[in-house]
A protein has these predicted regions:
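Surface-exposed, beta-sheet-biased, low-hydrophobicity segments with strongly acidic/polar composition
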Residues: 1-95
Length: 95
């Protein structure tokens, strides 16, 4: 996966496979991370937001968005870091 795959999805809702039903996560940001030349592709970070009533534990989720996916992504909860909207925030770091 690369940053270029996710930039068009910013602002869209992705579905994370959960029980009893998929959780809706909005992709609010996709940004590059400092490239130290240690990986075959530039590192990047994705930030997702869920509704206040949805709280995911850190782990691996199968995610989809329209024609994109399924892809397996590790998510972990993070601080809101200035986001004003209510809800929980999660990050996926690709390095």
């Amino acid at each position: 996966m690369t940053l270029d795959e996710f930039v068009p999805l910013v602002g869209q809702v992705l579905l994370a496979d959960c029980n009893p039903k998929p959780a809706e996560l909005k992709l609010v940001e996709a940004r590059p991370l400092p490239d130290r030349g240690l990986t075959s592709r530039p590192p990047f970070q994705l930030i997702f937001q869920s509704a206040p009533e949805i709280l995911l534990v850190a782990g691996i989720y199968v995610m989809r968005c329209g024609e994109w996916g399924p892809e397996i992504i590790y998510l972990e909860q993070m601080a809101s870091l200035g986001f004003k909207e209510p809800g929980h925030f999660y990050q996926a770091v690709f390095n």
